[in-house]
Amino acid sequence: MTAELVIDVHDLQKRYGERKVVDGLTLAVTAGEICGFLGANGSGKTTTIRMLCGLIKTDGGGGTCLGLDITKAAPQIRLQIGYMTQRFSFYEDLTVGENLYFVASVYELADRREAVRAIIERMGLEDRVDQLAGELSGGWKQRLALAACVLHKPKLLLLDEPTAGVDAKARREFWDLLHDMAGEGLTVLVSTHYMDEAQRCGRIVYLSDGKIVVQGTPDEVAHGSGLVTYTATGPDADAAARKLRNMPGVEAAAVFGSSVHIAGMDRAALEKAIASPEGGGGLKWHEVAPELEDVFIHLLSKPAKAAS
């Protein structure tokens, strides 16, 4: 049985002047999936999300979101999605409860008080109901924003770097909520720069210059990258990393405590570098599996080439 496609778009195009911000993007997201959107700033993530919900028009291509044509049915699409921007976009001079009741009124929910009560309980906002939104910490603001986005029980959640600037504990709790809702059938498309968040996605899509460069599960992307990675521990890790960064074949060299980690595509060149007295000689090296961070640093350093 074929899984239901909540997002199904083909060859999306968007230009600003001479610059192609989105260039032939094709994307399919199935019901109940958490799909991570990754890429450098300016890679086309936000523009794609805005085209999906009809906030900006495409310059080419098309497709459906929730079975509705993104070029013709934007108002109907927006009624069935929750869209959360990186910037907090609710009223800071209203309380948490007042903000949520206002959103319930905008969506003309039948039992607004019950809907607000239920979402406050689910999001753990009981102790914040009477607090002004402007007085909330970053983590609590994002939790309020998420509550407002799902108050009307959307079928699709579009999140644009929702946890930027939020502490690690709040980010983890936010993602726990996302997984709970995805388990109930909510579909999520979320952009992020955090590798720990990318690991929590069922599938990740990496964009560069408006093109999809690679996609798959986190393990598929990491193991299919072709990268070779080595790590070593020693007292001179910082000095070794500085030397190795300038050696042929070493695309990245990073220090983690007393360990140095290197990555590249050319195994022979890497092995020569770590054996060289001018590089990693004197440290005991062993090969390790590449991680997502290795892959994305590698992709950031390369010109965009669309995935086949």
Give names to the regions the model predicted:
Residues L157-D160:
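Catalytic Walker B motif of ABC-type/P-loop ATPase nucleotide-binding domains
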Residues K153:
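Conserved catalytic motifs of ABC-family nucleotide-binding domains
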Residues Y101, S105-R128:
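Conserved ABC ATPase "signature" region
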Residues G61-K72, I77:
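Conserved ABC transporter NBD signature motif
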Residues D93, L132-L136:
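Conserved ABC ATPase signature
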Residues F174-M265:
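ABC transporter nucleotide-binding domain
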